[in-house]
C-alpha cells in the first residue's frame, strides 16, 4: 500500500467517539482561503518521477479553517476554529434535544398525573407534543456530529420508520399515539424504531462525553418499551420507569447547554476531509506532506 493510500485509509478508521480537542493559544494568521493559486503535484508510489505531473488546485490552504484572532484546535487533518455557522448548528441541535425532552414530559404527564388533571388538557396536547418531539429528534439526527456516517444514516432510517408507524396509528385510529400505545402494547412495534433512534443518540452522547444520564437512558428507554410490550412490567413499574425516563431526558437536555461548542463538534477536520472529493483529498495530503510533515507522519503511522 502506498503512503498516500495508507493516509487515506487511516481517515476511514477514525473511531466515532468524539474527543474534545484542546484549545491552542490564539494566533494571527492570514485570511482563510479556500484554495491557493498554487499547483500541487500528486504522484502515486513508484510513479516515474520524470513523467509529466498530474496536478490539482483543488486543495484548500493548510490554514484555511483557522479563523484569524480566534482559538484554534489541532485536528487529525488540519487545525480548525469554531465559526459562527458551527455555533448556530450546535445550538440548534441542543434546542432540538430540548424539544424532545419537553415532548416526552408532555406525553407522559397523563400517566404520571392522571388523565383528568387540568381538565383533560394534558390528554389533548399529547398528539401535537408527540409529533413535535418526533420532528425535534429528526432535526437533531440531521445536526448531530458523528464520524461514522453509515451509523448516522441508520439512525435516521430508524427514525423515519418510527415516524411512519406513528403516522399510521394516528391516521388509522384518530387517537393520540401515546394514548393508543399505552392501551395497545403491540403498537410498540410500530413506534419502536423512533425510540431506538433516540436511544442511539443517548448512546453516542454517553460514550463521547461520559454522561451518566445518557448511559442510564440507553437502558431505561428499551426496558420501558419492552416491559410494556411483553407485559412483564406491572403498571407501577411502568410508571416508575417512565418517571425516571422523563427525569433523565430533562437532565440530558439541560446539561447540553453547559458544554463548550467545540466539544459538540469533535474533530472538525475529519468532517472537512470526508466532504472532499478524491482529487481534493490527494492534493490535500500532498500539500500536508510538503507543508506539515509532522502531521503527515502521524497520519501515515495510523495505518501501521
Question: Where are the language model's segments positioned?
Answer:
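N-terminal chloroplast transit peptides
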Residues: 1-37, 44-47
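Membrane-embedded alpha-helical segments that form the functional core of polytopic membrane enzymes
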Residues: 195
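Transmembrane helical hairpin unit
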Residues: 207-214, 230-232
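Central hydrophobic cores of alpha-helical transmembrane segments
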Residues: 212-223, 245
Amino acid at each position: 500500500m502506498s503512503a498516500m493510500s495508507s493516509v487515506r485509509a487511516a481517515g476511514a478508521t477514525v473511531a466515532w467517539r468524539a474527543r474534545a480537542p484542546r484549545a491552542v493559544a490564539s494566533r494571527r494568521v492570514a485570511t482563510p482561503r479556500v484554495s491557493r493559486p498554487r499547483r500541487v503535484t500528486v504522484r502515486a508510489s513508484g510513479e516515474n518521477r520524470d513523467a509529466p505531473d498530474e496536478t490539482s488546485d483543488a486543495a484548500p490552504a493548510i490554514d484555511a479553517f483557522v479563523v484569524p484572532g480566534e482559538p484554534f484546535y489541532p485536528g487529525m487533518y488540519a487545525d480548525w476554529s469554531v465559526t459562527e455557522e458551527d455555533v448556530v448548528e450546535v445550538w440548534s441541535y441542543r434546542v432540538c434535544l430540548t424539544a424532545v425532552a419537553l415532548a416526552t414530559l408532555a406525553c407522559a404527564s397523563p400517566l404520571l398525573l392522571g388523565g383528568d388533571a387540568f381538565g383533560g388538557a394534558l390528554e389533548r396536547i399529547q398528539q401535537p407534543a408527540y409529533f413535535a418531539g418526533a420532528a425535534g429528534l429528526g432535526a437533531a439526527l440531521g445536526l448531530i456530529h458523528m464520524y461514522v456516517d453509515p451509523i448516522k444514516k441508520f439512525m435516521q432510517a430508524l427514525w423515519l420508520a418510527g415516524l411512519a408507524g406513528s403516522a399510521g396509528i394516528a391516521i388509522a385510529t384518530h387517537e393520540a399515539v401515546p394514548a393508543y400505545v399505552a392501551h395497545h402494547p403491540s403498537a410498540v412495534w410500530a413506534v419502536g424504531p423512533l425510540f431506538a433512534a433516540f436511544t442511539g443518540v443517548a448512546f453516542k452522547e454517553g460514550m463521547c462525553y461520559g454522561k451518566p444520564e445518557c448511559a442510564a437512558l440507553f437502558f431505561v428507554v428499551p426496558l420501558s418499551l419492552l416491559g410494556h410490550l411483553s407485559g412483564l412490567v406491572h403498571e407501577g413499574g411502568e410508571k416508575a420507569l417512565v418517571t425516571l425516563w422523563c427525569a433523565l431526558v430533562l437532565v440530558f437536555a439541560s446539561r447540553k447547554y453547559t458544554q463548550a461548542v467545540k466539544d459538540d463538534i469533535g474533530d472538525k477536520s475529519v468532517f472537512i476531509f470526508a466532504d472532499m472529493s478524491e482529487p481534493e483529498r490527494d492534493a490535500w495530503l500532498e500539500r500536508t506532506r510538503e507543508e506539515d510533515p509532522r502531521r503527515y507522519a502521524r497520519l501515515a503511522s495510523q495505518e501501521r
